[in-house]
């Protein structure tokens, strides 16, 4: 999730053969924003069978911007890797790249890189490393 005045990015997925296990997932993220590293954040996420079976949709970016227009995200799935690219133009120009490696049906790693510019000036440079692991059934 991006912080500050950047649009809200919700990790949210239409995939081909790529699927993961439904259930309760522990998602750990570490963010470096403008050179400052945050402490790891750990969150739980319950994935339904529908969400787990449609990884490209579940993990695609969804943006909400004010005074900026976003193009539909371009995405590509190769083997067990999902990559996407989102661009928004307007008062805030945003360029976001995501790469998710689903190394097993119960584990993935990802990197999301975001650069935000206003009037051509870089105002936000964010890199988030993510690890997700299935920890059980949803409660």
Q: Where in the sequence are the language-model features?
A:
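Bacterial N-terminal signal peptides
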Residues: 1-10
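N-terminal helix-cap/turn-to-beta initiation motif at the start of protein domains
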Residues: 13-24
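Short, solvent-exposed loop/hinge segments that bridge or flank secondary-structure elements
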Residues: 28-61, 65
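Short, surface-exposed coil-to-beta transition loops
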Residues: 40-41, 92-98, 112, 124-128
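Mid-chain, structured segments of secreted extracytoplasmic proteins
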Residues: 58-99
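Edge beta-strand at a domain terminus
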Residues: 114-139
């Amino acid at each position: 999730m991006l912080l500050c005045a950047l649009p809200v990015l919700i990790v949210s997925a239409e995939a081909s053969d790529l699927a993961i296990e439904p259930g309760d997932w522990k998602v750990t993220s570490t963010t470096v924003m403008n050179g400052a590293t945050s402490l790891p954040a750990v969150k739980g996420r319950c994935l339904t069978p529908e969400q787990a079976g449609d990884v490209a949709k579940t993990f695609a970016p969804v943006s909400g911007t004010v005074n900026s227009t976003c193009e539909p995200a371009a995405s590509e799935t190769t083997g067990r890797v999902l990559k996407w690219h989102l661009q928004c133009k307007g008062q805030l120009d945003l360029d976001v790249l995501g790469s998710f490696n689903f190394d097993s049906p119960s584990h993935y790693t990802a990197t999301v890189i975001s650069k935000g510019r206003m009037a051509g000036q870089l105002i936000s440079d964010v890199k988030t490393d993510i690890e997700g692991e299935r920890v059980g059934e949803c409660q």
